[in-house]
């Protein structure tokens, strides 16, 4: 009593303003000298505070000292103040109650702390401090990191529930059973209110940790009440008014017995629930959606005794993964245009309110162009046309995520759809929010995809002419007279029978003539940046005396240096060309006489091929001649040689006769070192193979050296060329005689 009276005097001293001498004055209304003396003593012990009290921030060391003292001495502010020397008693008291308010704000209603129950409150505060130490964070900084804050709150709730279950189990193991008198009083109290046959649950505000007191008759304090919770009905009753201290102690003993009896009933119900948990889960799955339309929780709709404490805690501690999908394509495209991801997956606790999910979506997508109207959630099977036939959840819904999950049938994958909608004038029909941009349907998307596939197939089909590739953009190079097609379709035009080599992407070369398609020989040459003429002209120069080919050199790559080379298999290209032409007749395929191209020049560029063609008939030579009478020296195109190979010497073509006969009319020009375009100075060339009229010409080499089908016999030509180079001395004279005839 003396401590309470001293505390009352302190409060009165703080309320009375200071006098002129700085001493607090206390009005003694009862004119009691003892009261005045005790008040003066309290005033001298605790001087008046300053008008503006500054509550300094608590450092980590001060908080550690506070919780260490709280663990040792409990709720004793004077002893705690002696441990925390940098703070006074008022600051310690303020910190204690401020922490209680903060924890009640963060915890749910089932775990609210009562400051009148210091044992549970102190235990919860110590749990709070241990978790702060675990996460290495101050309480004032928790909200700055939402993820860590969420984990912190969940861990705290789990620990408090665990402590509460442990205390209940401890009391049960001690054998504190409910007396018959206590059960009779509870049953008669319920029977008076017509609640005898209904299951009920007792919730005591100050009954978790009640000290054992001596016997006696009891009555309650003002403010202590016994709440009877019957589903949604709560009744508060107060037993007795006033009385003596011994009656209060007797009531607390009865209250203790009642709590123990309720614990026994709860344990029995838990055991019964575990035996029939499968059946109850099936019943909850079969519940229709109309049961939850009133907004009641599934746990509150059933009786309180049907749900054990452990199962309820398991339900609340579980997690749900919610996948959100847009209600239609308009919403999806609008969010994607605003650089938002229209598909989200959220991890929620079971008791997370569905309205919190809507608030999160509004904060995330509130600036989007489609965020007009009210954001609603629907079941996953809802569509834009049938939204009025389905359930919906708004920001006013107070259901939890677990309840919504039960309403949609508790699927294995929890999915909902969202959309922005407005109500019409009557408020009964929901119409979708109109959007400014047109939204193509799913069929339009399928048509676009199908069109892209058709375009891809067209580019990979047969050989296309210039007219059929209208989407290609052509760039003309006047210096060489070439048309390089580079457009959407960068793949070579091939026939249906062609073998398609792997991983080839070659830019085709077209004729200047728009109506002429690419010939098969040109297509074979376009598969690599090494031309057929270059290949044949460099074979003799690179063969060693032992017949072993050294590594390939750069050669005459300047003719196609502008063509990108991405083919990784030249053997596959040759095989495709042979497969294309092996079944065709050996009739000669004349070239188009309306245009000249790089490939016409390269067909006669090879010096060896041209010299061997001197054996052939003049009609066969004329068939492979380039049109328009372009001047050539040893099969070289004069325009390209003069433009690109100045270091190899210039050529003076002769205009004596037929254009194809101009270059080889003087065979000594070809044999002179330094002037051969392909660098074949070391190769022995005969003086003239034409007039010798050898039998080998007509019987062995005539058919092989005809460039039939525009290089159709490519493989035979290569084999014959190599064979002819090795047997070149069979046709000529002695080496000295040949050198005497050379200029």
Curated annotation (Swiss-Prot):
Residues 488-499 have a biased composition (Basic and acidic residues). Residues 53-104 form the SANT domain. It comes from the Eukaryota. One of its GO terms (cellular component) is nucleus. It is found in: Nucleus. Phosphorylated in vitro by TOUSLED. GO terms for molecular function: chromatin binding; DNA binding. Residues 486-523, 626-679 are annotated as: Disordered. Expressed in flowers, roots and leaves. Its main location: nucleus. Keywords: DNA-binding, Nucleus, Phosphoprotein, Transcription, Transcription regulation. InterPro entries: Cramped-like, Homeodomain-like_sf, SANT/Myb, SANT_dom. Interacts only with active kinase forms of TOUSLED. Interacts with SNL1. The Myb domain is not required for TOUSLED binding. This is TSL-kinase interacting protein 1. It comes from Arabidopsis thaliana. The gene is TKI1.
């Amino acid at each position: 009593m003396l401590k309470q009276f001293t505390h009352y005097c302190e409060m009165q001293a703080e309320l009375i303003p200071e006098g002129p001498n700085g001493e607090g004055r206390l009005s003694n209304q009862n004119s009691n000298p003892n009261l005045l003396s005790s008040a003066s003593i309290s005033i001298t012990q605790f001087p008046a505070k300053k008008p503006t009290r500054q509550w300094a921030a608590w450092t980590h060391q001060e908080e550690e000292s506070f919780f260490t003292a709280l663990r040792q001495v409990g709720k004793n502010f004077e002893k705690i103040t002696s441990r925390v020397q940098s703070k006074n008693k008022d600051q310690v008291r303020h910190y204690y109650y401020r922490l209680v308010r903060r924890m009640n704000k963060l915890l749910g209603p089932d775990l609210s702390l009562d400051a009148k129950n210091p044992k549970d409150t102190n235990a919860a505060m110590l749990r709070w401090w241990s978790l702060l130490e675990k996460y290495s964070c101050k309480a004032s900084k928790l909200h700055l990191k939402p993820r860590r804050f969420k984990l912190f709150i969940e861990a705290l709730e789990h620990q408090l529930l665990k402590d509460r279950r442990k205390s209940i189990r401890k009391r049960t193991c001690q054998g504190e059973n409910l007396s018959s008198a206590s059960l009779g009083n509870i049953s008669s109290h319920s029977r008076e209110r017509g609640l005898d046959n209904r299951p009920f649950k007792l919730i005591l505000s100050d009954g978790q940790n009640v000290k054992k007191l001596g016997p006696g008759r009891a009555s309650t304090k003002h403010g202590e009440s016994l709440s009877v919770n019957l589903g949604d009905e709560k009744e508060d009753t107060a037993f007795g008014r006033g009385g003596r201290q011994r009656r209060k102690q007797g009531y607390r003993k009865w209250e203790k017995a009642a709590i123990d009896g309720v614990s026994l009933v709860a344990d029995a119900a838990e055991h019964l629930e575990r035996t029939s948990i499968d059946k109850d889960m099936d019943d909850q799955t079969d519940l229709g959606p109309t049961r939850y339309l009133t907004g009641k929780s599934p746990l509150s709709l059933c009786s309180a005794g049907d749900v054990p404490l452990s199962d309820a805690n398991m339900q609340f501690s579980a997690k749900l993964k919610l996948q959100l999908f847009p209600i239609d394509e308009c919403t999806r495209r609008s969010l994607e245009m605003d650089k938002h991801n229209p598909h989200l997956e959220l991890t929620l606790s079971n008791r997370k309110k569905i309205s919190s999910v809507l608030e999160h979506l509004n904060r995330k997508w509130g600036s989007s162009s489609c965020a007009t109207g009210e954001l609603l959630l629907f079941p996953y099977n809802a569509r834009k046309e049938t939204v009025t036939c389905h359930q919906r959840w708004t920001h006013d819904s107070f259901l939890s995520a677990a309840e919504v999950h039960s309403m949609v049938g508790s699927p294995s994958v929890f999915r909902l759809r969202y959309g922005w909608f407005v109500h019409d004038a009557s408020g009964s029909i929901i119409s979708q929010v109109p959007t400014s941009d047109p939204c193509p349907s799913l069929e339009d998307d399928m048509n676009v995809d199908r069109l892209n596939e058709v375009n891809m197939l067209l580019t990979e089909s047969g050989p296309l002419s210039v007219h059929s590739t209208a989407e290609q953009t052509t760039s003309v190079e006047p210096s060489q007279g070439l048309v390089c097609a580079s457009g959407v379709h960068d793949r070579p035009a091939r026939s249906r029978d062609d073998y398609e080599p792997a991983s080839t992407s070659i830019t085709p070369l077209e004729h200047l003539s728009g109506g002429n398609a690419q010939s098969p020989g040109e297509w074979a040459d376009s598969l690599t940046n090494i031309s057929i003429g270059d290949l044949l002209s460099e074979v003799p120069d690179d063969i060693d005396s032992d017949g072993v080919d050294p590594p390939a050199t750069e050669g005459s790559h300047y003719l196609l240096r502008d063509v990108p080379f991405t083919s990784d298999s030249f053997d596959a290209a040759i095989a495709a060309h042979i497969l294309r032409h092996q079944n065709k007749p050996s009739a000669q395929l004349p070239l188009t006489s309306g245009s000249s191209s790089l490939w016409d020049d390269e067909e006669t560029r090879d010096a060896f091929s041209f010299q061997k063609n001197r054996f052939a008939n003049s009609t066969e030579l004329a068939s492979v001649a380039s049109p328009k009478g372009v001047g050539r020296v040893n099969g070289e195109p004069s325009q390209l040689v003069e433009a690109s190979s100045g270091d190899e010497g210039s050529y003076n073509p002769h205009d004596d006769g037929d254009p194809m006969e101009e270059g080889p009319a003087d065979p000594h020009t070809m044999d002179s070192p330094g002037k051969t375009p392909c660098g074949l100075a070391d190769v022995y060339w005969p003086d003239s193979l034409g007039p010798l009229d050898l039998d080998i010409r007509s019987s062995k080499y005539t058919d092989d050296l005809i460039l039939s089908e525009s290089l159709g016999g490519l493989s035979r030509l290569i084999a014959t060329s190599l064979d002819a180079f090795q047997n070149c001395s069979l046709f000529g004279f002695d080496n000295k005689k040949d050198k005497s005839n050379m200029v």
